[in-house]
Structures are given as C-alpha cells and as structure tokens.
Amino acid sequence: MRVLTGLQPSGDLHIGNYFGAIKQMVDAQEKSQMFMFIANYHAMTSSQDGEKLKQNSLKAAAAFLSLGIDPQKSVFWLQSDVKEVMELYWILSQFTPMGLLERAHSYKDKVAKGLSASHGLFSYPVLMAADILLFDTRIVPVGKDQIQHVEIARDIALKVNNEWGEIFTLPEAKVNEEVAVVVGTDGAKMSKSYQNTIDIFSSEKTLKKQISSIVTDSTALEDPKDHENCNIFKIAKLFLDESGQKELQIRYEKGGEGYGHFKMYLNELVNAYFKEAREKYNELLEKPSHLKEILDFGAIKARKIAQEKMQKIYEKIGL
C-alpha cells in the first residue's frame, strides 16, 4: 500500500507537525511503501525568498531524517526535483472546475489571515492533487484541516478516470483521531501562523520560554485541577503511555502542585523525547552536501515512477 505525505519547509518543525503527521510516517515505514517529500513548491505561496526557501528546505530534510525517516525504506525527495509534478498540475487544471476550488476552506482561511490572494494559493489543491495522483497514492495521512484537499484530489481523479479510463488510483485521507489536532500554547490548533508552537529543534532556553507561555486557568496551587481542559495535560499526554497519563491525572486531581510544576514536567518530557533527534539534526546541518545526496537518491526513485506515469498520461492526452 502506497502512502504519501509532504511538509512545507516553512520554518522550524513543532510537535504538532511531529505528532500530527511525521510520527505516523515513521511508524508506517515497516509496513507500507512510504513516499515523503519536502513541499518547496507549495511553500512559495507564502514566501518567495529564494535563499530562505533553500535553507528551510535543508533544515526540513535534516529534521525529517533526524526524526526517523529512513531513505533506504522510504522514498524521500525535494518536490522541485521531480518536475513532472508541475506538468501534471497543469493537465489536472483542465479537469478542475472553478467551483471546486472556490469551496476550499484553506484558501479562504489563509487569505483571511493576510496571505496574498494569488493564483498559486487558489490552485494549491490542484498541485496537491498532482503530488498525490502522480504516484498512485492510496493513503494520505493528514490533519483534519487537510481532509478537503484529499477529497478534491479524489474528485479530480474521478473526473479524469471518467474521461480516460482508470488511470489514477483514488486516494483516501487517513486521520489519526487522537492526535489529528495538537493544541498550541494558547489552546488553539498548534500552528506557526498562530505563533503558538513548541518547536522541536529550538534551544533549551527557547523551549522553556514556549512551554512557560502555555495558557492555563487561575486554579490555586493547593486545589485539584481539571486535567481534561488543561492545555499542559493535552500536550503532555502525547509523550506518555496510558500508565503515565494516569499518574499525571492523579497529580492534577490531588492538588498541591501549581501549573508551574506541570510546565516544568512537560519541559523535561519534551527534552528527553527529542534529545537524540536534536543531536542528529545538528550533525546533519553541518553536512549540507550529504543532505543533498540523500535527497538526490530519493528524487531518482521518485522521477522514475513519475516518468512512467506521465508516459501513460501523454498517450491519453495526445502529447
């Protein structure tokens, strides 16, 4: 079963990225054909700073690898190294009704938050469809906010298949319901756009500051606390097994500890969990040529599949 996901190189990764998508991909490497790419074309919808995009792409590659993506088990590449995706993007555009894109929630949300209402942003779901359909993807792990984009890809695939025959595999979105939306420090969905993240590869000083900023209620230190509605607990449970969650719940219900104590505990959890990944990340960033070699290795495998797919499409469309 082929599984594909992409992540924009738009800055430092946070724990929402990890628990919402990356961990699922790492865990699935033993069972499925994993295809993972750094979505630098998609990143251009929010920034056209070339040097920044290049550096962020290398940082994203180092992050993926340090968090457990194995280039021997997964196909791992830079989106722009497989040009066929842009060809397919244009072809799929001819099968995409304007109304389908006008209903996209993500476009409206991003424009409302200040992003330029460009054609690239508007047609973002078509490029995402090209990413997915080019590789005959069966499963696309996504957060709840991206389900609609996978549905759009499926709608486009159905339209093409009705015209040309069964040329595209119909993709399905897969959402891990337990961690699909990781809360940020303010209780909203964790997102760089909201500036409420806990970054994986930040310094210990920055990490402590981010965790200290988690919004809590005003329950007194000595009183029992509501763990179910506490942002600290919601984040901490991601790092704990069932037994650990139960122990933390008991501490909340017992009282005698303030939110400052729980923030210190969360800080320890995050530092311990990502210790090895941080060390590997820093080592990889010191070897950009090695990172490029790994991405090139994946791009060769991805291009071979993409070229074979495009040849079938050329025959259908008369190119």
What are these regions (language model features)?
Residues 148, 154-319:
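Conserved nucleotide- and phosphate/pyrophosphate-binding catalytic cores
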Residues 75-78, 141, 219:
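Short catalytic-loop micro-motif centered on adjacent basic/acidic residues
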Residues 98-102, 134-141, 240-248, 278:
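Short helix-capping/linker segments at secondary-structure and domain boundaries
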Residues 2-130, 282:
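N-terminal Rossmann-like or analogous alpha/beta NTP/dinucleotide-binding catalytic cores
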Residues 49-50, 139-143, 222:
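Short, polar/flexible loop-turn hinges at active-site or ligand-entry regions and domain interfaces
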Residues 106-160, 164, 183:
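Internal, conserved structured core segments that host functional sites
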